[in-house]
């Protein structure tokens, strides 16, 4: 786990496309942690299944989060919990769009907790404009 003086959180997602809901969750995480890594999933087998390439999504997110000094954007192609461990993150922060997300996220939380019990997993519901794209 990271040192207490550099609290790192990972905000994983597809971000295809980026929404104001994504930026709301990222912004709130940036207020709570010293460093927030926005982790854009880049799975080669999903090529052609996303609206934008991973490189485009990284560029869009980098531009959208530019005012947040403690946010950086990276791609990943491993399990989220493995990526968080590699970055020495103390937390994984994800958004909840609707109640239907809860069951899936609950199951993922159980699996992640078994693999990395020292990493906190937080869920945040978006305040407004959840599905409106940037």
Predicted regions and their residues:
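Nucleotidyltransferase catalytic core that binds NTPs
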Residues: 1-132
């Amino acid at each position: 786990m990271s040192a207490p003086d550099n609290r790192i959180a990972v905000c994983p997602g597809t971000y295809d496309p980026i929404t104001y809901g994504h930026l709301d969750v990222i912004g709130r995480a940036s207020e709570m942690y010293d460093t927030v890594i926005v982790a854009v999933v880049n799975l080669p087998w999903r090529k052609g299944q996303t609206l934008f390439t991973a490189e485009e999504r990284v560029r869009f997110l980098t531009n959208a989060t530019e005012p947040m000094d403690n946010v950086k954007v990276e791609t990943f192609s491993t399990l989220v919990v493995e990526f968080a461990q590699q970055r020495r993150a103390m937390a994984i922060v994800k958004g909840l769009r609707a109640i239907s997300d809860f069951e899936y996220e609950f199951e993922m939380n159980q699996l992640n907790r078994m693999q990395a019990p020292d990493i906190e997993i937080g869920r945040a519901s978006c305040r407004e404009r959840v599905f409106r794209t940037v």
